[in-house]
Amino acid sequence: MASSCAVQVKLELGHRAQVRKKPTVEGFTHDWMVFVRGPEHSNIQHFVEKVVFHLHESFPRPKRVCKDPPYKVEESGYAGFILPIEVYFKNKEEPKKVRFDYDLFLHLEGHPPVNHLRCEKLTFNNPTEDFRRKLLKAGGDPNRSIHTSSSSSSSSSSSSSSSSSSSSSSSSSSSSSSSSSSSSSSSSSSTSFSKPHKLMKEHKEKPSKDSREHKSAFKEPSRDHNKSSKDSSKKPKENKPLKEEKIVPKMAFKEPKPMSKEPKADSNLLTVTSGQQDKKAPSKRPPASDSEELSAKKRKKSSSEALFKSFSSAPPLILTCSADKKQIKDKSHVKMGKVKIESETSEKKKSMLPPFDDIVDPNDSDVEENMSSKSDSEQPSPASSSSSSSSSFTPSQTRQQGPLRSIMKDLHSDDNEEESDEAEDNDNDSEMERPVNRGGSRSRRVSLSDGSDSESSSASSPLHHEPPPPLLKTNNNQILEVKSPIKQSKSDKQIKNGECDKAYLDELVELHRRLMTLRERHILQQIVNLIEETGHFHITNTTFDFDLCSLDKTTVRKLQSYLETSGTS
């Protein structure tokens, strides 16, 4: 392993890709070319026996072998994928080949053409004399230590000339690695070989993170090729002017979930005898229909991680609620009470949730519906489904008439109307949705959520912060929504007709008020556990909803006892 016996050679792996002016009949939208070469056009053929490109299986003859330079493959497609490249050495002893998993990513239309260059440094320790001579002929650097730091070279931003990307080597990687704003990017890594057949990769694939963001999720359909692999590899031009036309589906460009990642930083140890960095077959990015699902999962995952981080830095717990007055008996104060509660809620919203400006009025279902559609389109995260599920689960107040008129009409309805509405309620017990303007009592809901969910889950009430993930077992970013409209089970109807008088309603209002001020996470966890035992709850992807009025008195008493303990602690 002495440095005096080490020879270092460099390989450049890269690809160029640009959007075609017109898609082909098969729907191909990009022309691309991938290559392996020596730096500054040094002749790596001296020590390279052949280069094998393992294209995706959807291509005809996916295994492309290039025995003579230029070692390149030109194709058309509309998909990015991980392309395993095997470089075989003219070496009688191990190592006889090295494998790289190359990320052949494509840019979307409107972005600059891709011109990516990846520099690989191969250090052979104690090579045989014959192989050493071959390495030196190919521009190998003798007497180099295996710990030589990797340097990176930058390719030129031109993508029309096949030799353009080797012309510049002085640009910094940091500027060239941002593939979203520049059409060229570069990276470097170092590989060392020794007699014990170990291969050490020190990967510094700087643009891989950025480039993955621009990968397109699509599938490479089959394409007939009458040329031999040798002919296609020798073809000098990189952009084929194919004239077939077909409009490619718009959904073809979805952000994918990267199936196979390039080697990560700092020394993945691999045995050269296998010659494989990764046994996986090249993973194809899924077609448009599946890519939506995968990209949604990816966004959910990243959003969940972001929410998890925000939980740890969020305040212990802040609860707000759009609780309208439950009592109807005292009609003279209802209007004032409503205005007061709404103003209090909006004050709480401003003081407790300063970052969120777009919380909708709880009575404005039109805004609410717009909001849910907006959040679905703009925020494809786990929170995005909560607005639609909440708005469908929470009875809307304005689907029949204007919000204030319908509410005031109900508030001033007589007791007979209330009783007849209760009878209707009995028929609607099994339904989770029903207009709130029945019986004059309007729904009150407590939504517990972390701050990042506020815009999309604001369906019909202001939001509040959720405690960290341990609060809810089902999901680490779920919303706990406590609803108490006058939807009641039949047993609760009997209670209402008999025992459940104004005093009980007062208790529920008080319970709601105390839930608003509750901040102890362990108490909230107890509440969730209790509601789970009753079975009277509804779980969507992002919410945990339950109805206070559907709970029996025993459960309500337990809730009150939890609040008592929180008050004394």
Swiss-Prot record:
It is found in: Nucleus; Chromosome. GO terms for biological process: anterior/posterior pattern specification; gene expression; hematopoietic stem cell differentiation; negative regulation of canonical Wnt signaling pathway; positive regulation of DNA-templated transcription; positive regulation of Wnt signaling pathway, planar cell polarity pathway; regulation of chromatin organization; regulation of stem cell division. The keyword Transcription applies. Chromatin reader component of the super elongation complex (SEC), a complex required to increase the catalytic rate of RNA polymerase II transcription by suppressing transient pausing by the polymerase at multiple sites along the DNA. Specifically recognizes and binds acylated histone H3, with a preference for histone H3 that is crotonylated. Crotonylation marks active promoters and enhancers and confers resistance to transcriptional repressors. Recognizes and binds histone H3 crotonylated at 'Lys-9' (H3K9cr), and with slightly lower affinity histone H3 crotonylated at 'Lys-18' (H3K18cr). One of its GO terms (molecular function) is DNA binding. It comes from Mus musculus (Mouse). Residues 1-138 form the YEATS domain. Residues 138-476 are annotated as: Disordered. This is Protein AF-9. The keyword Transcription applies. Ubiquitously expressed. Strong expression in the spleen. The modification Phosphoserine is found at S289, S295, S413, S420, S484. Pfam families: AHD, YEATS. Residues 149-190, 304-314, 372-396, 446-462 have a biased composition (Low complexity). Residues 358-369, 415-430 have a biased composition (Acidic residues). It comes from the Eukaryota. Keywords: Activator, Chromosome, DNA-binding, Isopeptide bond, Nucleus, Phosphoprotein, Transcription, Transcription regulation, Ubl conjugation.
